[in-house]
UniProtKB/Swiss-Prot annotation:
Record family assignment: Belongs to the NfuA family.
InterPro entries: Fe/S_biogenesis_protein_NfuA, FeS_biogenesis, FSCA_dom_sf, HesB-like_dom_sf, NIF_FeS_clus_asmbl_NifU_C
Keywords in alphabetical order: 4Fe-4S, Iron, Iron-sulfur, Metal-binding
SUPFAM superfamilies: Fe-S cluster assembly (FSCA) domain-like, HesB-like domain
Name the record gives this protein: Fe/S biogenesis protein NfuA
Quaternary structure and partners: Homodimer.
Species in which this protein is naturally found: Colwellia psychrerythraea (strain 34H / ATCC BAA-681)
Residues that coordinate or bind [4Fe-4S] cluster: C149, C152
Gene (name only): nfuA
Amino acid sequence: MITISENAQQHFIKLLSQQAEGTHIRVFVVNPGTAKAECGVSYCPPDAVEADDIQLPFEGFSAMVDADSKGFLEDAEIDFTTDQMGSQLTLKAPNAKLRKVADDAPLFERVHYFLQAEVNPQLAGHGGECTLVEITDDGYAVLQFGGGCNGCAQIDVTVKDGIEKQLIELMAGEIKGVKDATEHERGDHSYY
C-alpha cells in the first residue's frame, strides 16, 4: 500500500522518539477522490487510533491509515531527502485524486482512470484537459478536450502519437484507437 524509504523511516523514528510512548504516524488524504485531494502525515497518539484504522508495521514504528484513505493511498511513496538546500519529506500519492481501479474493472473505468491519472496531469501543464465521452462498440475511445487543448495546433499529435499509442499498448485487443469529439475553436485559450 505505502512505501516508506529507509531515510524516511529513520526520520520518523527520530521524530517519534520525542513523542509520548506508543505514538505512531498517521498517513491520510483530505478530500480523497476529488481535485482538491491533499495528502498528509501527522502524529497519531494511542488515543487517536480508530477501530477501523489499518496498521502498517515498520521497524520501530507503525503507520496508521484510516479506512477512507486506504484506496487512495495505493502505491503511495514517502521519502526523506537532504541536500545543500536542507531536508524535505515528500509524499507522492498518485491515486489520491482518483481511486485506482482494478485490472478487471470495466473498460470504461480503466480508460477513464488512465486519462485522469496519466494524461490530464500532463495536459494541465498547458491548461488543458480531456474526458472520456464513450467507448464505441468497435473499440474506439471517444475523447472531449477542453482548456488549452481546444483549438491547439498540436492536438493531432497529442491524440495519435500520445494518448492513442499508450491506450492501444495498455489495453491491447480492447482499444483500437482514439477519436476526438471536440469541436476545436482556435482562440486565446489554445496552447499552440
